[in-house]
Amino acid sequence: MVPVIALVGRPNVGKSTMFNRLTKTRDAIVGDLSGLTRDRQYGDASWQGRSYILIDTGGITGDEVGMDEKMAEQSLMAIEEADYVLFLVDARAGMTAADQMIAEHLRKRNKEAILVANKIDNIDADVARAEFSPLGMGNAIPVAGSQGRGINALMEAVLGHIPRDPVEDALDEDVAEGEEATRIPGPSEKDGIKIAIIGRPNVGKSTLVNRMLGEERVVVYDQPGTTRDSIYIPFERDGEKYTFIDTAGVRKRGKIHEEVEKFSVVKTLQAIKDANVVIFVMDAREGVVDHDLNLLGFALDAGRAVVIALNKWDGMEPGERDYVKTELERRLFFVDFADIHFISALHGTGVGHLYKSVQAAFMSAVTRWPTSRLTQILEDAISVHQPPLVNGRRIKLRYAHLGGANPPLIVIHGNQTDKIPNSYSRYLENTYRRVLKLVGTPIRIEYKGGDNPFEGKKNTLTDRQVNKKRRLMSHHKKAEKKRRDKRK
């Protein structure tokens, strides 16, 4: 299971800055005013091949009322959700009563917490660490979140004991030249292909799992939120091993009231991260709603292969079906690489075809290709459509290699790669998808510019070059003097 890390602390200790630093985004609001984070925010992050989910929370002071009280509830709930807690304190401001209150709460909950002394820039880190020793949370790890100082030491303390993703290890060695494309080790022999069934509440996820399994393994009731936790169900079909991850439906934030249902959100996000393929279930009778797009977007951001299942297709009139198909084409244009199935989980119509799409999406996500193959595709694409000119110079792309899997990451090396427009990146992405016959999985293109070996080096002349330069300068001076004399 992908670990969950929560950032907690009193207001304005740098939690949102740390969130942005670790997730490499600017999703969290950052400022000098306390209370800018009003709700839990989830982010997808990784460190040295180890993926995790990060939760940013509002500050806790212990004397909250009104909106601040709701914010504190969100922070305490994040502590319950998390596997690890990063307890941030302000090294400049020193220890406060709010810090002591949070430390006491963490001890009562028996949570694995690491004390983080933030904002240690321009102050003595050892003195700052000693000031917080009365909290009884062990030695504080000094960091400067705004500058990135101490982040590696912090993440080593949190995630250093967790094994690297086997996919990352498999990519450490490239496919040998001339070798055929091979599958990168992904699912274990025990679990098989892990499939997360996700979607809004009451779209028929548990009914679909039961239909695909052929037995009643998950509680099904016509009421949203019947499944309160993610359920892992191993099974075998046609000699292939699978593990279903059935999740609670994710509701809009404003509709989440019960505490147990709030916990289900992080379970769904964990299931997406833990899966190899996501079956995204939608209600055909309700069509495409904004919350579907948000949930689908998280699956794509996590890089998961996707199969879309439009449930409750039976009983719909032809005109209604045509309208839904038009809406799918219009609103799901960003995931046009995913197979779409029109099914009835209740009656079993079209359900059996999902397995073929799951297999195809999984193989597309974890297959690796030799550098020679990826480079040849790049050269063929350039011969058809060259990169644009920048300041009169043509962008040069030299070679490509595989940099990751699930999703496939193709790293392209060249010059002026930071000037490549998005339209050309989409062209290359579509070319790789078409030639490699990839379905169901997103593709990521990453560029690396060529390093100038002489950058930063002073051009020092040898003694021989210095003498030659002097002779040339002397010759030029004599020649110039002769030309001036002739003019006279």
Swiss-Prot record:
Region (Disordered), start-end ranges: 449-488
Keywords: GTP-binding, Nucleotide-binding, Repeat, Ribosome biogenesis
Entry's Gene Ontology molecular function annotations: GTP binding; ribosome binding
InterPro entries found in the cross-reference section: G_ENGA, GTP-bd, GTPase_Der, KH_dom-like, KH_dom-like_a/b, P-loop_NTPase, Small_GTP-bd
Protein residues bound to GTP 1: 9-16, 56-60, 118-121
Transmembrane stretches, start-end: none
Subunit description: Associates with the 50S ribosomal subunit.
Similarity annotation: Belongs to the TRAFAC class TrmE-Era-EngA-EngB-Septin-like GTPase superfamily. EngA (Der) GTPase family.
Name the record gives this protein: GTPase Der
Organism from which the protein derives: Pseudomonas entomophila (strain L48)
Gene: der
